[in-house]
């Protein structure tokens, strides 16, 4: 058998070729079998987005599971698509327009939408091609976009159904205005940042000589004040309740009212009430039936309800100008620095302004109750379980969802207003086309729906709902959702609510929340901090498999993932090891006869049992979404058991003078290599597929082969335990050589003394050829006098090595004493930490666990070094 494997591991030389091979052979399509179904939807990335490490982690973990299920012969469908991302995409487009001296006002609505579709078509390929680089094995033929016609149909149906049930309504409420986009955003789209600001102390005059002092961080909003509130128990102001004050820089008078909401201890204890621009003031205004005055335009400028000289100014410019005028006219008593939490739109970065506006809302409490019951009944499960608390908190404290957005790009609200009568009709199309509305004129609501309004339908709308399609019947509900913690409410909870409301089922059973990515300093990776790692850089440097394996290996369920670019060497070294070990085997295939009838000896049976154990470990790990454990099982099997032990031992037979022995050895190596490639494939699909293609039948694709299952007939407990004990002998001698800097190539005499009840003596003697190759002894003695030899005790037997002529006893004792002192000091340091109550109460859990592991490690090293010292002294 001949082959043409590359000289060295070079993923750039074959990864694209392999992916195209999978596409050409329809590897990613469901097999439509009668076997158990497994379906999953991917969180749709923004259509104009670019791949970041969070995407990479999410898609890699999804793909590993999908490939595993596909190889387990599940009827597997992984659905992928992109999100139209209303605010984000329109912002990108308007920024592009600005660069060429244009704005959205230069376009009719339909033309504007068409132009954004062109941008979408141009950019969609970027994120999609980047996700392909990860090896994502989603069904390309079923790729969706949230503005596809079928998804628009689903969105409109849901809107109409909720409206008819009284769960969608329109009303005037205080909402969050993003001045950058001119649109409102939901509470969940706001991130709070601590910023340096000012606290202004302003005089509101009652008459020419008396005033009440107000502390405010936003003096520009005083033009929207409709009252001053004080606490009714505040003795300072009791006599002023009911009196009027004049708003500074105006002639407008407002009343002083009493309300228990006012904190007497904050500022001056008197609160300006601006109902149209503060949520607390809005609630106070409802209690006291006072008016609401909006002073802002939708793009964050001051409007006609402020004095003329401030109209049209931005908030920042108005604040600066007002501060000067307040000071000049004697209204400003003082200013001091004030650090405060300010809400920003997480998409645009703009400061959010509370804004009184008429918007569309979904009444969420009735939907949330069902979603909570789904968790309580076990229909829905979170991994790690701790995220259930976040889910419950959000749903237990849910507010109505503002779903209208003042954008052009998105699902236009299917609401129409009669121009003459203001009659409201909910319809997909212009109601005037209906014969019962002949002569009536209608205009459609200009707003679009929140992006999440289409995303919350994703698990079933992407399968063709509201039509009951074959895909919907076959693959809904899906099995698993893999996503990030920060969209548990945005997306996960809402999908559960929508699924229960419109299909009567939870849209998925299991929700796995991926680790939070942090840098090595523990800071969350973010664009603003500039501490992210570009996954494409990692792929270019090390290959996709290296990225995949590292992310999986380090993804501990329930723990943050602190990572830097150097960590990806872990995956690179492993992929390289797989390549080189495979290459060694394939090189030895040349001019060999491959036997089909394999004869397994004790060492083969040990590896078969180890393989069985690995298969069970991987299965259990995936059942509980423990990616790091699954990765470690395959890593340990391949690197330690297969490479370090089995291949090394096989070299004895490969170098035999008997050709049949040689052929049997390489046949068994090839057998185990295929098994290894199969269990590794979900983690490192590119290199395993490449290697497999070099010795498999033409057209045979590894990704479509069946994942190995536990085989009771290949479970040899006795042989496994025998070799396990035998390994302790080899490892102990290797460690001893290493500890005393004796080259592995130097032959030494070794002696063994077995305990009277030791049952593996015959096994040790029968496998002398293996122990000689692995530890390179000169002579081996059994149960003889071992005077003058360095001894080590292990369970069941004692090991002695003749090293006295190879080491300087005095120097070694000095070295070991120094080592002993070093580890004793380290142990004391760790012990003090673990005895410190403050440390145990305040340190992160993973740090405490790390210190505990150090304590155990240092204790073990101290015992080992003490043993060496005692044995050396007895030489």
Swiss-Prot record:
Q: Per the UniProt entry, what are the Gene Ontology biological process annotations, in alphabetical order?
A: valyl-tRNA aminoacylation
Which residues does the annotation say bind ATP?
527
Tell me what reaction this enzyme catalyses. tRNA(Val) + L-valine + ATP = L-valyl-tRNA(Val) + AMP + diphosphate
Record's CDD domains? Anticodon_Ia_Val, ValRS_core
Tell me the domain of life: Bacteria
Please report, in chain numbering, the residue ranges of the motif 'HIGH' region.
45-55
The molecular function terms of the Gene Ontology recorded here are: aminoacyl-tRNA deacylase activity; ATP binding; valine-tRNA ligase activity
Q: Which UniProt keywords apply?
A: Aminoacyl-tRNA synthetase, ATP-binding, Coiled coil, Cytoplasm, Ligase, Nucleotide-binding, Protein biosynthesis
Question: Which HAMAP family does its entry note?
Answer: Val_tRNA_synth_type1
The UniProt comment on domains reads:
ValRS has two distinct active sites: one for aminoacylation and one for editing. The misactivated threonine is translocated from the active site to the editing site.
Which function does this protein serve? Catalyzes the attachment of valine to tRNA(Val). As ValRS can inadvertently accommodate and process structurally similar amino acids such as threonine, to avoid such errors, it has a 'posttransfer' editing activity that hydrolyzes mischarged Thr-tRNA(Val) in a tRNA-dependent manner.
Mind telling me what this protein is named? Valine--tRNA ligase
Whichever gene encodes this chain, its name is valS
């Amino acid at each position: 058998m001949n082959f043409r494997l590359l000289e060295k591991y070079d993923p750039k030389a074959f990864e694209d070729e392999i992916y195209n091979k999978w596409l050409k052979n329809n590897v990613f399509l469901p097999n439509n079998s009668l076997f158990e179904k497994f379906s999953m939807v991917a969180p749709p990335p923004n259509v104009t987005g670019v791949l970041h490490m969070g995407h990479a982690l999410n898609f890699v973990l999804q793909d590993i599971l999908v490939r595993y299920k596909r190889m387990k012969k599940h009827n597997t469908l992984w659905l992928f698509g992109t999100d139209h991302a209303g605010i984000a995409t329109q912002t990108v487009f308007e920024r592009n327009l600005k660069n060429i001296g244009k704005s959205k006002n230069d376009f009719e609505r339909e033309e504007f939408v068409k132009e954004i579709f062109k941008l979408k078509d141009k950019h969609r390929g970027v994120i999609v091609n980047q996700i392909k680089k990860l090896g994502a094995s989603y069904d390309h033929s079923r790729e969706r976009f949230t503005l596809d016609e079928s998804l628009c149909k689903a969105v409109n149906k849901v809107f109409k159904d909720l409206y008819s049930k009284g769960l969608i309504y329109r009303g005037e409420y205080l909402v969050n205005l993003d001045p950058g986009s001119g649109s409102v955003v939901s509470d969940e789209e706001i991130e709070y940042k601590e910023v340096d600001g000012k606290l202004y102390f302003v005089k509101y005059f009652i008459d020419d000589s008396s005033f009440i002092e107000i502390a405010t961080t936003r003096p520009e909003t005083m033009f929207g004040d409709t009252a001053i509130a004080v606490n009714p128990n505040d003795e300072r102001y009791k006599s002023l309740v009911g009196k009027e004050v004049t708003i500074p820089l105006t002639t407008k008078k407002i009343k002083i009212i009493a309300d228990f909401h006012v904190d007497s201890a904050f500022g001056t204890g008197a609160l300006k009430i601006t109902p149209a621009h503060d949520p607390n003031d809005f609630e106070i205004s409802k209690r006291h039936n006072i008016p609401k005055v909006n002073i802002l335009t939708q793009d964050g400028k001051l409007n006609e309800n402020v004095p003329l000289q401030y109209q049209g100014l931005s908030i920042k410019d108005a604040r600066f100008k007002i501060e000067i005028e307040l000071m000049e006219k004697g209204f400003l008593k003082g200013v001091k620095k004030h650090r405060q939490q300010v809400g920003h739109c997480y998409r645009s970065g703009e400061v959010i302004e509370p804004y009184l506006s008429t918007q569309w809302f979904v009444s969420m409490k009735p939907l949330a109750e069902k979603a909570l019951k789904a968790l309580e009944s076990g229909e829905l499960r979170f991994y790690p379980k701790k995220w259930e608390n976040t889910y419950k908190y959000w749903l237990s404290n849910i507010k109505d969802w503002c779903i209208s957005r003042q954008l052009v790009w998105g699902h236009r609200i299917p609401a129409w207003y009669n121009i003459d009568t203001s009659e409201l009709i909910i319809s997909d199309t212009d109601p005037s086309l209906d014969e019962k509305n002949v002569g009536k004129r209608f205009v459609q609501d200009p707003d679009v729906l929140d992006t999440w309004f289409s995303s919350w339908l994703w698990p079933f709308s992407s399968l063709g709902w509201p039509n009951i399609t074959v895909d919907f019947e076959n693959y809904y509900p899906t099995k698993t959702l893999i996503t990030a913690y920060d969209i548990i409410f945005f997306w996960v909870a809402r999908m559960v609510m929508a699924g229960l409301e419109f299909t009567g089922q939870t849209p998925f059973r299991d929700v796995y929340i991926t680790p939070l990515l942090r840098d090595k300093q523990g800071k969350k990776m973010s664009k603003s901090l500039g501490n992210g790692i570009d996954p494409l850089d990692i792929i270019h440097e090390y290959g996709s498999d290296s990225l995949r394996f590292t992310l999986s290996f380090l993804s501990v369920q329930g723990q943050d993932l602190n990572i830097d670019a150097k960590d990806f060497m872990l995956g690179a070294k492993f992929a390289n090891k797989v390549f080189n070990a495979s290459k060694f085997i394939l090189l030895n295939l040349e001019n060999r006869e491959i036997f089909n009838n394999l004869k397994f000896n004790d060492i083969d049976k040990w590896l078969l049992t180890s393989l069985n154990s690995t298969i069970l470990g991987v299965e259990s790990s995936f059942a509980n979404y423990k990616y790091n454990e699954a990765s470690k099982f395959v890593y340990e099997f391949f690197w330690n058991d297969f490479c370090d032990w089995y291949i090394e031992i096989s070299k004895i037979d490969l170098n035999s003078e008997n050709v049949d022995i040689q052929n049997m050895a390489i046949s068994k190596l090839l057998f185990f290599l295929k098994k290894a490639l199969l269990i590794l494939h979900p983690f490192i699909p590119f290199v395993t597929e490449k290697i497999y293609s070099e010795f498999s039948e033409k057209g045979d694709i590894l990704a479509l082969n069946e994942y190995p299952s536990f085989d009771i007939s290949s479970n040899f407990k006795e042989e496994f335990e025998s070799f396990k004990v035998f390994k302790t002998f080899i490892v102990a001698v290797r460690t001893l050589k290493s500890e005393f800097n004796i080259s592995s190539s130097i032959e030494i005499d070794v002696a063994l003394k077995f305990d009277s009840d030791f049952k593996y003596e015959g096994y040790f003697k029968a496998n002398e050829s293996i122990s000689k190759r692995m530890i390179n002894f000169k002579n081996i003695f059994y149960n003889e006098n071992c005077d003058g030899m360095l001894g080590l005790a292990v369970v069941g037997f004692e090991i002695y090595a003749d090293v006295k002529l190879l080491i300087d006893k005095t120097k070694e004792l000095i070295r070991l004493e120094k080592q002993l002192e070093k580890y004793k000091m380290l142990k004391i340091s760790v012990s003090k930490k673990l005895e410190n109550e403050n440390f145990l109460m305040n340190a992160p859990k993973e740090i405490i666990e790390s210190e505990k592991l150090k304590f155990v490690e240092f204790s073990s090293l101290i015992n080992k070094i003490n043993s060496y010292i005692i044995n050396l002294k007895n030489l």
